[in-house]
Amino acid sequence: MSGALDVLQMKEEDVLKFLAAGTHLGGTNLDFQMEQYIYKRKSDGIYIINLKRTWEKLLLAARAIVAIENPADVSVISSRNTGQRAVLKFAAATGATPIAGRFTPGTFTNQIQAAFREPRLLVVTDPRADHQPLTEASYVNLPTIALCNTDSPLRYVDIAIPCNNKGAHSVGLMWWMLAREVLRMRGTISREHPWEVMPDLYFYRDPEEIEKEEQAAAEKAVTKEEFQGEWTAPAPEFTATQPEVADWSEGVQVPSVPIQQFPTEDWSAQPATEDWSAAPTAQATEWVGATTDWS
């Protein structure tokens, strides 16, 4: 499909992206029309998709999209959550018309309703989930392109791109690859330089996970501010005020306290001694008399 041109050959970095996103991993069931895109079967029953065939059908789908003169005549649809963000990003990059979410029955066939449109090409994410637009496309002779897994029915599908259309990373990467090839074939971007848009922008993210991440980031920021506030708070300034003394020789005036005068005794005088041989006093004899009678 690449026409033996080195420019259109699959690069090693593209193969690494496919393997990292799990694009080559199919399901455990196999549709008979998808057998031509299968490389091998693993021991656990999972079929492995041939990435060479995936790349060839991707280039064919990009050529079909580029062949439409008005980009708005290309309708890209995804009713599953994993492909809605990728569809909107693809439409913003290539100018296609996105239908993300529920497809209103009769959009391609009922001319009375306000949502009626007549596209020239239809690209869907999952033939099983997007069966209603595929069926209506068959009524109005509308060519269709679909991302098909190993168990996807190929009824009403004109160009099937074999890949893993269940994983969020695989679906986002396939839409990113398709948008990049469309822009390269239009000449909008060069093949010599990598596309500045990252595949992460096409990945589906659960709103609950995003809310949890934002809450965790906010709590982390608050904790960081509190931690920094405890250690980086400015220390209180202590300014010791020194009394102003004009003449340091004068010093500080100390209040005078009157000195109490105590009488002085003559230590050289002979102290008065008592006569120890004198008779005891009457009080002492009373105690002696009271204590000697033990009988």
Curated annotation (Swiss-Prot):
Keywords: Acetylation, Cell membrane, Cytoplasm, Disease variant, Host cell receptor for virus entry, Host-virus interaction, Isopeptide bond, Membrane, Nucleus, Phosphoprotein, Receptor, Repeat, Ribonucleoprotein, Ribosomal protein, Ubl conjugation. The modification N-acetylserine is found at residue 2. Acylated. Acylation may be a prerequisite for conversion of the monomeric 37 kDa laminin receptor precursor (37LRP) to the mature dimeric 67 kDa laminin receptor (67LR), and may provide a mechanism for membrane association. Cleaved by stromelysin-3 (ST3) at the cell surface. Cleavage by stromelysin-3 may be a mechanism to alter cell-extracellular matrix interactions. One of its GO terms (biological process) is ribosomal small subunit assembly. GO terms for cellular component: cytoplasm; cytosol; cytosolic ribosome; cytosolic small ribosomal subunit; extracellular exosome; membrane; nucleoplasm; nucleus. Belongs to the universal ribosomal protein uS2 family. This protein appears to have acquired a second function as a laminin receptor specifically in the vertebrate lineage. It is thought that in vertebrates 37/67 kDa laminin receptor acquired a dual function during evolution. It developed from the ribosomal protein SA, playing an essential role in the protein biosynthesis lacking any laminin binding activity, to a cell surface receptor with laminin binding activity. HAMAP family: Ribosomal_S2_euk (MF_03015), Ribosomal_S2_laminin_receptor (MF_03016). This is Small ribosomal subunit protein uS2. It comes from Homo sapiens.
